[in-house]
């Protein structure tokens, strides 16, 4: 990642240390009894934990909340998925207990699939990002593509992402692999050295 992040031309400033961004590890996407629960979440979370341990506090956790304006197409969306049309403080939208200790920073709460935007950029600046979370085929890919458009350097840890099912996960990973060099698809073993502090 050092070579990919690189030094800016003519600059002696070293690149910023990468951050881990964990997308939406919430009950609604993780619980086996949720209509949107990912069967891949337990295995992916084990890798998320490894990445967070390596990042030494440079971790942001995001949360999707059902607060979008119902006068827009989000109203149609929640009409199609009435089980999810609940108040933002419903336990369905809580971060899963095992993810609450991943980050020392406040959770970034947004009503959009994609989490890339000024709220996130204010915290991490231009640092490279390792992306993980759930679901690969919705909020992860939406975040990754917006990050690519913004000029971010993003590594997707594929085995630290959980799709709605394995086929949809694989399809989303394939799409994200079409966006080098902004997006790089890797696995946890390859992403760990990017996050560990330099000696």
Feature roles, as predicted:
Residues 2-19, 47, 53-57, 83-199:
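Active-site-adjacent betaalpha module
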Residues 16, 33-65:
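A short alpha/beta connector and helix-capping loop motif
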Residues 19-25:
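N-terminal nucleotide-binding beta1-loop-alpha1 segment
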Residues 23, 62, 158:
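Active-site flanking residues adjacent to catalytic metal/cofactor-binding acidic residues
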Residues 26-32:
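Short acidic, Gly/Ser-rich segments with clustered Asp/Glu that frequently serve as metal-coordination loops
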Residues 27, 66, 162:
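Short, glycine/acidic-enriched loop or turn micro-motifs at the edges of active sites
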Residues 39, 76-80, 172-175:
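Short, hinge-like loop/turn segments at secondary-structure boundaries
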Residues 68-87:
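Acidic/polar short surface loop at catalytic or gating sites that assists cofactor/ion binding
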């Amino acid at each position: 990642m050092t070579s990919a992040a690189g030094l800016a031309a003519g600059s002696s400033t070293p690149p910023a240390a990468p951050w881990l961004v964990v997308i939406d590890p919430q009950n609604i996407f993780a619980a086996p009894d949720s209509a949107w629960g990912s069967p891949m979440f337990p295995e992916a979370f084990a890798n998320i934990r490894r990445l967070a341990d390596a990042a030494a506090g440079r971790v942001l956790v995001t949360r999707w909340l059902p607060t979008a304006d119902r006068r827009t197409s989000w109203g149609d969306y929640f009409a199609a998925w009435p089980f999810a049309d609940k108040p933002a403080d419903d336990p369905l939208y809580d971060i899963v207990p095992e993810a609450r200790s991943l980050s020392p920073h406040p959770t970034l709460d947004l009503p959009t699939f994609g989490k890339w935007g000024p709220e996130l950029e204010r915290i991490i600046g231009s640092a490279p990002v390792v992306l993980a979370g759930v679901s690969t085929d919705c909020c992860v890919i939406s975040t990754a593509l917006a990050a690519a458009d913004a000029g971010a350097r993003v590594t997707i840890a594929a085995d630290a992402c959980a799709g709605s099912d394995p086929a949809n996960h694989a399809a989303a990973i394939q799409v994200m692999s079409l966006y080098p060099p902004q997006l790089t698809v890797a696995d946890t073993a390859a992403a760990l050295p990017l996050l560990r502090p330099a000696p």
